């Protein structure tokens, strides 16, 4: 089941009702507007959905390939995008990049100034890392290091990004100019998420080997580290437990509270929003086990949040912005992923090339209590390794 958002049952119910209303409106719009999907496409999508439920990944790869062929034949960018997303989850990054780029070109056409990986000399390069929904930063953070790699191909490169990420990207890629999304900028060549993935993200092994961590403010990192270290000699572990999304399945509060109580670490909340009701349930009477630092608000100051994350020894989190940021900074992390086939996390293996220092633990039909037991064992191994080596990332 999904945790009550931040510990408030009322907010959880209201949010769920809102989701149902949005789904109803979307269904109604689908009935009365836009082209109808051919019966063959609907049957193919139903087949793919059944394979996902059975977790038949070999069968799904074949089904996804059928979906891609159908999408290409029908010139259907939405179906093509879905096939690309599925291939990434299945670990076929080359096919995923190809389909996503083709889907974008079908929707918007191929631009004459589209960058395809060539050296640009004196030509300027504009790299757009802007999502339609500024609250959704996972894809932006994932592709940020690819933007830095692309910037090296031009004497003058500009990266356009959501304002909260300007500082950390500018610090990480000082040779580029990083500007907020609202800035009107032009370039001789233009690159998007899809172009970056096509140029740099088709080989999973190379993607992992070429990892460049985002660089948090070193002075702020040290400030947070000293503050938290003054409270404990235990390892410092970031924790993010909940989501506003009703489509995500995450551990409930009693399961998280048991995990906290059983783990020899000092936890630091990385959860966004109004979390005080949740803190009471997670601490379970032991306030000292979980630090809540109200000087940090990731919705306002992502650079400060990045420094807080970088100050920690490890992170345990569900799939959210904290997961992507911890992975992109290079903090050893444990990512808890549900069985819903809707995010970029892999469905097989325990690693993702996007974040080489992260460990992916999928639910795989188990109770969350057992998943958290595994997370505890993997976290213990991470902390033991850190204690045996000089600190540094």
Regions found by a protein language model. Give the residues of each.
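Catalytic machinery of carbohydrate-active enzymes
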Residues: 2-393
């Amino acid at each position: 089941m999904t945790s009550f958002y931040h510990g408030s049952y009322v907010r959880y119910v209201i949010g769920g009702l809102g989701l149902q209303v949005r789904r109803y409106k979307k269904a109604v719009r689908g009935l009365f507007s836009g082209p109808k999907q051919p019966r063959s496409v609907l049957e193919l999508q139903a087949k793919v959905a059944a394979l996902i439920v059975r977790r038949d990944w070999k069968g799904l790869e074949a089904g996804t390939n059928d979906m891609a062929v159908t999408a290409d034949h029908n010139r259907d960018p939405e179906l093509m995008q879905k096939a690309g997303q599925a291939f990434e989850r299945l670990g076929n990054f080359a096919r995923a990049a190809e389909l996503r780029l083709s889907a974008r070109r079908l929707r918007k056409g191929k631009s004459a100034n589209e960058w395809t990986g060539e050296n640009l000399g004196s030509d300027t390069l504009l790299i757009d890392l802007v999502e339609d929904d500024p609250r959704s930063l996972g894809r932006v953070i994932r592709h940020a290091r690819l933007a830095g790699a692309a910037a090296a191909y031009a004497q003058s490169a500009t990266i356009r990004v959501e304002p909260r990420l300007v500082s950390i990207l500018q610090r990480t890629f000082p040779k580029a100019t990083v500007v907020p999304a609202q800035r009107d900028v032009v370039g001789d060549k233009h690159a998007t998420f899809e172009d970056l993935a096509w140029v740099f993200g088709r080989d999973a092994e190379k993607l992992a080997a070429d990892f460049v961590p985002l660089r948090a403010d070193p002075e702020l990192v040290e400030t947070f580290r000293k503050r938290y270290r003054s409270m404990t000699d235990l390892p410092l572990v970031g924790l993010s437990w909940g989501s506003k999304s009703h489509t995500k399945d995450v551990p409930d509060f009693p399961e998280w509270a048991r995990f906290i109580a059983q783990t020899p670490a000092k936890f630091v909340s990385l959860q966004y929003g109004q979390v005080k009701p949740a803190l009471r349930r997670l601490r379970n009477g032991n306030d000292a086990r979980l630090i809540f630092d109200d000087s940090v608000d990731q919705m306002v100051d992502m650079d400060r949040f990045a420094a807080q994350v970088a100050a920690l020894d490890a992170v345990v989190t569900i799939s959210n912005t904290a997961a992507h940021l911890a992975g992109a900074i290079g903090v050893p992390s444990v990512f808890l992923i549900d069985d819903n086939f809707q995010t970029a996390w892999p469905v097989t293996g325990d690693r993702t090339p996007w974040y080489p220092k992260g460990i992916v633990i999928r639910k795989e039909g188990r109770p969350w209590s057992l998943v958290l037991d595994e997370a505890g064992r993997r976290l213990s191994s991470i902390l033991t390794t850190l204690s045996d080596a000089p600190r540094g990332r």
